[in-house]
Regions:
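A glycine-rich helix->loop->beta "capping" turn
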Residues: 83-84, 105-119, 125-130
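Catalytic loop of short-chain dehydrogenase/reductase
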Residues: 29, 122, 126-130, 136, ...
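C-terminal helical subdomain
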Residues: 248-291, 301-305, 309, 313
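Canonical Rossmann dinucleotide-binding motif of NAD(H)/NADP(H)-dependent dehydrogenases/reductases
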Residues: 27-63
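Conserved glycine-rich Rossmann-like NAD(P)H-binding loop of the short-chain dehydrogenase/reductase
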Residues: 58-74
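Rossmann-fold cofactor-recognition segment
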Residues: 81-97
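Active-site Tyr-X3-Lys motif and surrounding loop/helix of classical short-chain dehydrogenase/reductase
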Residues: 101, 105-108, 133-140
């Protein structure tokens, strides 16, 4: 499943009060009551959980995404008694059908629109495997699902931004490992495969796509990439392989999820401190983070266009 780079040379690039939880009704539209609404994917633990809880504490209505309905409901319950509303939504984002399921749920849950989409869900695996769509699993979750979800929710993001004269915001969680990635030639990642290589390449592709999307949407919808740095979460453990070992050995040097969550929340809620298309690095004790250039490859306009075009072809349009 090539992605159309065959004519290009892209080498290596350096007590408890019950919270206000709204259950999804799959038959009737569910209107959210809050004036400010966000979807946070991967919100059952780690950075996503911290972001969702922080936004809800600010009075936002938060759509809390998990891979299963049970996990999403449990995460919303753990967020506690918050001023905002909590709406559990669920989908497995490895497949296009899973992405469509989440898009449909969000359209029913928030028909009046979203202010913010936080694409936090991510994955890594200890062995090569393909989804039912023929895509390597890491690439499917970390890039193609993000692109498909963002595209499927564009119509919700657009009206809110225009009505408030302040663009809606899409926040992509990236990784500094993108700087060590090989550009993807085939969504299936055939041939030699490593866990770290697949993860880095998926993040490079998504970052390039992020830049391309920011250019196309310009001031209509603001798009940001946030690099959380090395964070102590259950991600490494669940990934297995080298990432699990790195998580065990590096845990004392890693930050808590709350640090990058502060940066994400600041990016989502404060007057724009960064132009759309910014790569923002989470910095200790500085909520708004700071701009830091990403890899040369990710900033190459030709590469961005090719990733965008290849992604659109996969998504169907």
């Amino acid at each position: 499943m090539g992605i159309g780079f065959s004519g290009l040379d892209f080498g290596i690039a350096i007590p408890f009060c019950a919270p206000r939880i709204r259950a999804m009704d799959t038959t009737n539209p569910l209107a959210v009551p809050s004036a400010s609404t966000a979807l946070v994917t991967g919100a059952t633990s780690g950075i996503g959980f911290s972001v969702g809880r922080a936004l809800a504490r600010l009075g936002w209505t938060v759509l809390v995404h998990g891979r299963s309905a049970e996990r999403a409901r449990e995460a919303a319950a753990r967020m506690g008694d918050v001023p905002g509303g909590l709406i559990p939504v669920d989908a497995d984002l490895e497949t296009r059908s899973g992405v469509r399921r989440l898009v449909d749920q969000v359209h029913r849950a928030a028909p009046d629109g979203l202010n913010v989409l936080v694409n936090n869900a991510g994955a890594a695996f200890d062995r090569h495997g393909l989804t039912v769509d023929g895509v390597e699993r890491t690439v499917a979750v970390n890039h193609l699902a993000v692109a498909g979800l963002t595209r499927g929710l564009e119509s919700l993001l657009k009206p809110i931004g225009e009505q408030r004269n302040s663009p809606a915001r899409v926040i992509m969680m990236t990784s500094y490992l993108e700087a060590r990635a090989r550009p993807i030639q085939d969504w299936a990642l055939p041939g030699e495969w490593t866990q770290m290589g697949a993860y880095a390449s998926s993040k490079l592709a998504n970052l390039a796509y992020t830049y391309a999307l920011a250019e196309r949407w310009r001031d209509r919808i603001a798009v940001y990439a946030v690099d959380p740095g090395a964070v102590r979460t259950g991600f490494q453990r669940s990934a297995g392989g080298p990432l699990h070992l790195i998580g065990l050995l590096g845990a004392p040097l890693m930050s808590s999820p709350e640090r990058p969550a502060r940066t994400v929340v600041a990016t989502a809620t404060r007057p724009a401190a960064h132009p759309s298309g910014s790569y923002i690095r989470a910095v200790r004790a500085v909520d708004t983070g700071r701009d830091k250039p990403s890899s040369v490859r990710s900033r190459d306009r030709a590469y961005q266009r090719h990733v965008y075009d290849a992604t659109q072809r996969f998504l169907g349009g």
